[in-house]
Amino acid sequence: MSMLCYTLIIAFLIGIWAAPKSEDNVPLGSPATSDLSDTSCAQTHEGLKTSRNTDQRHPAPKKAEDQELGSAANIIVDPKLFQKRRFQSSRVLFSTQPPPLSRDEQSVEFLDNEDALNRNIRAKRETHPVHNRGEHSVCDSISVWVANKTNATDIKGNMVTVMVDVNLNNEVYMQYFFETKCRNPNPNPVPSGCRGIDSRHWNSYCTTTQAYVRALTMEGNRASWRFIRIDTACVCVIIRKTDNF
């Protein structure tokens, strides 16, 4: 009887020893652990590759300020916006290349390469006009076409975003503004003052003035016309002298 019990106990212990061990209890460095580590590393590597490819296909969104100040060439503008004459200004130009230095008295314009070239030729003829009567300006001014204007003050006194360029009929047009300002502005009256002013009785100085023109601006995600303020003239300001001067 005792021999039978011993035999059963030994058989039971041998069966327990021969049973497969659980993966949770496998010691480090065992083949099962190595397989799991290799599998985990492979999955992690594949996950990194997938994430990198996903980032390349779907780049991170830009900041709102970058989108607001960026180029508007991707914004398609309806040509009907330019059909109404009340939206046109002689100091606003839409062109595919930089316009000439001088300006023709025209309304909102669109210049292709050939038109701009012809106007450049006309501009060279008009750059140095001949004054036969000794005509002089009271204040020296300079006029230039301004590009890349991104912000301006509208007629309500608010800062608005100006469209630098627009996509019209699958062509990108830059928006230019013809601005005039004093060559050497001086906000304080000086003895010399403006040209041709009697300095014995008047103090004078030159200053840049502004006017409103209609420009294409951004309102949310769409283009709209607004009155914005730009430099348009250089004028002379005179102040009568008193006995205290």
Curated annotation (Swiss-Prot):
Residues 47-66 have a biased composition (Basic and acidic residues). Residues 47-69 are annotated as: Disordered. Residues 1-18 form the signal peptide. GO terms for biological process: cell surface receptor protein tyrosine kinase signaling pathway; modulation of chemical synaptic transmission; negative regulation of neuron apoptotic process; nerve development; nerve growth factor signaling pathway; neuron projection morphogenesis. Expressed by the venom gland. It is found in: Secreted. GO terms for molecular function: growth factor activity; lipid binding; metalloendopeptidase inhibitor activity; nerve growth factor receptor binding; toxin activity. Pfam families: NGF. Residues 19-125 form a propeptide. Gene3D superfamilies: Cystine-knot cytokines. Its main location: secreted. Glycans are attached at residues 148, 151. Disulfide bonds join 139-206, 182-234, 194-236. It comes from the Eukaryota. SUPFAM superfamilies: Cystine-knot cytokines. GO terms for cellular component: axon; dendrite; extracellular space; synaptic vesicle. Homodimer; non-covalently linked. Nerve growth factor is important for the development and maintenance of the sympathetic and sensory nervous systems. It stimulates division and differentiation of sympathetic and embryonic sensory neurons as well as basal forebrain cholinergic neurons in the brain. Its relevance in the snake venom is not clear. However, it has been shown to inhibit metalloproteinase-dependent proteolysis of platelet glycoprotein Ib alpha, suggesting a metalloproteinase inhibition to prevent metalloprotease autodigestion and/or protection against prey proteases. Belongs to the NGF-beta family. This is Venom nerve growth factor 1.
